[in-house]
Amino acid sequence: MNHPSARTTAPDGTPVGEAPSPLTFEYVREHPRVRLYVRMADAALEQIGYTEHGERHVGLVSRIAYNVMRRMGRPERMADLAAIAGTLHDIGNSVNRDHHAQTGGLMALMLLRDFGMQEEEILTVISAIGNHHENDGDPVNDVAAALILADKSDVHRTRVRNPDMIKFDIHDRVNYAVEKSFLNVDEDQKHITLELTIDPKISHVMEYFEIFMTRMLASRKAALHLGATFGLQVNGNRLV
């Protein structure tokens, strides 16, 4: 049962208007409070030297999560929930990087209730957010699995804030070496492949494995949850 349409406000108290029922991805993405949370989370991470986690990242994750769900035959509404989870998945970083997935889930709970989302859908979204981080999360539902795959696939040089630091920071170096990344979902073969184009003059493939092995394991587990296998392809060569 849906809540009545909710009237919501911007951070400065300005009325935003009634949220649609069912709640849409577009409404969540464009809401001033959501955009503020995303911006502040990214600003906090910038202060401690992390790669970009702002609107570019969450926008890409939302689109990929939606596409994963649809290509794997999941209903349109569940794909919308994956996109909403993608928009909100990193807002917990505005509080602290540690346990940001769980913190973000609780923040999303308050936002989505204010927006009038149906309770079962809220629980689906916040459990996905709370489980998206590779160190302490699991694909507890389809939305979580799609979110994990989408989040871990965003490796690209555009995420590096200061290219001058790539000599000193392995995470920046590996991200900067990636010229192209694409999550290829083969719905017929039920196989999901992360395809990367890496400049070996900047970072060796082994450095990628050194820092992203846990992400690859999380991606494999997520693919299995969706009934697919997972693989990694680098510069046209299948590695996993």
Residues covered by each model-derived region:
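Non-transmembrane, amphipathic alpha-helical segments
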Residues: 50-53, 138, 211
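Long, highly charged amphipathic alpha-helices
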Residues: 64, 106-107, 214-218
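Acidic/His-rich, divalent-metal-binding segments that scaffold phosphate/diphosphate chemistry
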Residues: 2-100, 110
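Terminal helices and disordered tails flanking the catalytic cores of nucleotide-processing hydrolases
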Residues: 154-240
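Divalent metal-dependent catalytic cores for phosphoryl transfer on phosphate-bearing substrates
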Residues: 46-47, 57, 70-185
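Generic alpha-helical secondary structure signal
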Residues: 22, 32-35, 39, 76, ...
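Charged, low-complexity surface segments at secondary-structure and domain boundaries
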Residues: 9-10, 134, 200-204
